[in-house]
Amino acid sequence: MAEEFVQQRLANNKVTIFVKFTCPFCRNALDILNKFSFKRGAYEIVDIKEFKPENELRDYFEQITGGRTVPRIFFGKTSIGGYSDLLEIDNMDALGDILSSIGVLRTC
C-alpha cells in the first residue's frame, strides 16, 4: 500500500517532496524549492499525514532511499535524499541547472 501511494505520486510529477509541515527541515527544503518557478504539474508537495500508518510509509522510504526521515525529495523517480542533500546541491549553485535539465522550470 505504501509503495502504491508513493509510486502514484512519482509517476505523475517531475519533482515530488514528501513532507510533514511541522518539520523544520521540511519547511527549509520547501523554502529552497520555492525559489524556483515550476511548470504547472511539475512539482508536488505530499504531506505524509495523508497516509496511515505513517510507519509503513517510512519503512518504504527506507527501502527505496535508505532513509526514513522527511523530507524525502525525488526528481522524477530518483531520490536525491533529504534536506541536507538538497541544501548541498543548492549551495553548489547546481540546483537551477538540474531542475532546468529535467524540464520542470518555466521559461520566461
Curated annotation (Swiss-Prot):
InterPro entries: GLR_AS, GLRX1, Glutaredoxin, Glutaredoxin_euk/vir, Glutaredoxin_subgr, Thioredoxin-like_sf
Key words, A-Z: Disulfide bond, Electron transport, Redox-active center, Transport, Virion
Pfam family, one: Glutaredoxin
Major localization class: virion
PROSITE patterns: GLUTAREDOXIN_1, GLUTAREDOXIN_2
UniProt superkingdom: Viruses
Biological function: Has thioltransferase and dehydroascorbate reductase activities.
Protein known as: Glutaredoxin-1
Phylogenetic classification of the source organism: Viruses, Varidnaviria, Bamfordvirae, Nucleocytoviricota, Pokkesviricetes
